[in-house]
Swiss-Prot record:
One of its GO terms (biological process) is farnesyl diphosphate metabolic process. Binds 3 Mn(2+) ions per subunit. Its main location: cytoplasm. CDD domains: Terpene_cyclase_plant_C1. This is Alpha-farnesene synthase. Mn(2+) 1 binds at residues 326, 330. Keywords: Cytoplasm, Lyase, Magnesium, Manganese, Metal-binding. The Asp-Asp-Xaa-Xaa-Asp/Glu (DDXXD/E) motif is important for the catalytic activity, presumably through binding to Mg(2+). It holds the Pfam family Terpene_synth. The keyword Chloroplast does not apply. Belongs to the terpene synthase family. Tpsd subfamily. GO terms for molecular function: alpha-farnesene synthase activity; magnesium ion binding; sesquiterpene synthase activity. Gene3D superfamilies: Farnesyl Diphosphate Synthase, Terpene synthase, N-terminal domain.
Amino acid sequence: MSSLAVDDAERRVGDYHPNLWDDALIQSLSTPYGASPYRDVAEKLIGEIKEMFASISIEDGDDEICYFLQRLWMIDNVERLGISRHFENEIKAAMEDVYSRHWSDKGIACGRHSVVADLNSTALAFRTLRLHGYSVCSDVFKIFQDQKGEFACSADQTEGEIKGILNLLRASLIAFPGERILQEAEIFATTYLKEALPKIQGSRLSQEIEYVLEYGWLTDLPRLETRNYIEVLAEEITPYFKKPCMAVEKLLKLAKIEFNLFHSLQQTELKHLSRWWKDSGFAQLTFTRHRHVEFYTLASCIAMEPKHSAFRLGFAKLCYLGIVLDDIYDTYGKMEELELFTAAIKRWDTSTTECLPEYMKGVYMAFYDCVNEMARQAEKTQGWDTLDYARKTWEALIDAFMEEAKWISSGYVPTFQKYLDNGKVSFGYRAATLQPILTLDIPLPLHILQEIDFPSSFNDLASSILRLRGDICGYQAERSRGEQASSISCYMKDNPGSTEEDALSHVNAMIGDKIPEFNWEFMKPSKAPISSKKYAFDILRAFYHLYKYRDGFSIAKIETKKLVMRTVLDPVPM
């Protein structure tokens, strides 16, 4: 087979804005925060905070309940500040104590002599325990409802009550299927907090509420939450700690240093990624979305341990390559080229590039090298050769891309179910997740890996949620490029007479039903380590975050740019 000639005049292209992050800009970045004195201070603070964990005892509190709340407060804060990895043993011991000695299906009172359950304490304990894998029943919140099934609140909206209802909202967002009381709690708490905001506008509490109302659970990102909570905690005083100023000061100082130490590492990794992008010749591909920096941002928002460099860089490279391939199959590539490229991917032989057009050769080689390198990294941590498994994952994605290319070429609009079955694969969640997770120092034998990989419910739900949300944000732009098939158009085809509003309502309802199911798949007991499930869960949240307001992959110069600045490029003030 001879190489195909390239005729750009006959090709479709997407109307995408150019790369926002020039390589020269990235290479010029600098920061003082990688210096050893900062690391020395961090180590000292870690030791002091460990002592704080150990020093919390019944004698230090007013009573046993105060002691319990102090420990719970510490857990919640070190997690939200992004420093919990230093205190895993302390957190585990504290959680065992909280669950075995203090948790009750009647809620938690605010003092030894009180028989009235406290909403703030109960909601915080419920959320923390559930996220750590403990079995807690949402019926505990029934004691805070009146005979009509409505949540009780005062007319005054005191700061203490507002904090309690904020924690109720945070707890309600991790609902499992069928937990109607948490659905009711979410509606009540959201309404209450929106009404309370004007009364506390400008306060740190209002900043915390605004963040939770905006990002909730599924669009939150660990590093973004850390950045926000550092700003919130700077002036927050909690009633739960005997010496709150001392506790806040030490936690806040460590969080700032850790944030900026990681910021220094991010710059080093980002420079490597940008050089790879430039040296691979991707800048010459004018038809695609250059979002390598944005993908790195997502990776570093969910994998904040310094040792996980292979995860961050691998995720960024693979996702970038995935979006280049998506643009080739959806718009730029001709059908005969796509068939050749698909065959070359399946043969996994660099000699097959001879038959490809020039623009495809570089993409193929970068893809081939990256997948192989990720497999080598994974073998170091997993002890088994993951390449064939990874190749099958990518082949499935390429087949799904090819199917959609045929639909585009013929103007075909499939049934809703046929579209979704293919679209769950073509979104690329599985391909983006598999190899990066295998580079983590978390053993995942094949039989355990398949609890979060295809064809598990975990993977199916994540892929479905992302495909449906992506369609909601992108179907109009895709239609303008000649891509007729989407969950919106397919629903309308299946239901003659229905409107776009009907289709959007149906798709949003599907997502709403799937989120509690996905919460359950994430938090239910299983053989898969909760840490590996957490990374897979956070990858979904990272993608979902960019679809909160619009297609943040295609339009990356608004909210996505702000995310890059707040979590990667800008350190926190010391």
